[in-house]
Amino acid sequence: MNYTQTLEFLFQSLPVFETQGATAYKPGLERITAFCRHIGNPQRNFFTIHVAGTNGKGSVAHIIASVLQQAGYRTGLFTSPHLQDFRERIRINGVPVSQAFVVDFVEKHRSFFEPLHPSFFELATACLLYTSDAAD
């Protein structure tokens, strides 16, 4: 699959909250926990700042990432939703992951995640965690 086909597959086969609303919501941590275990629990190897709230999360997250980059840290940034391109969600030092990375991630892990039935958000989160080796 190429990048466009990969995104079409993801949007058509996974529940997407931004387009389907509450029907896409999947409570529980079982799927993301299983996915993390499958990819080697990368979340255990880096520090995390979680920004929550009603408004301004994206702006605050970008500011924090920028400050940390200026201090010499290599940062990973995950935001949701994206405006134009899925890769906006996952950035390493301000640069979106490559199209090839997204395609490779989906192809490599598809046989694992299809029977798991993750949400689109859970798959995007796992994709970010998989890039964690590139960040401090």
What are the language-model segments listed below?
Residues 105-122:
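ATP-dependent adenylate-handling ligase core
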Residues 41-44, 83, 132:
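Solvent-exposed alpha-helices and their adjacent loops that cap or buttress functional pockets
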Residues 1-53, 60-62, 66-71:
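Short functional linear segments
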Residues 63-108:
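N-terminal phosphate/diphosphate-binding loop that engages ATP/GTP or pyrophosphate donors
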Residues 130-136:
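Conserved small/polar residues in nucleotide/adenosyl-binding loops
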Residues 36-40, 110, 129:
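Generic structural signal for well-ordered alpha-helical scaffold segments
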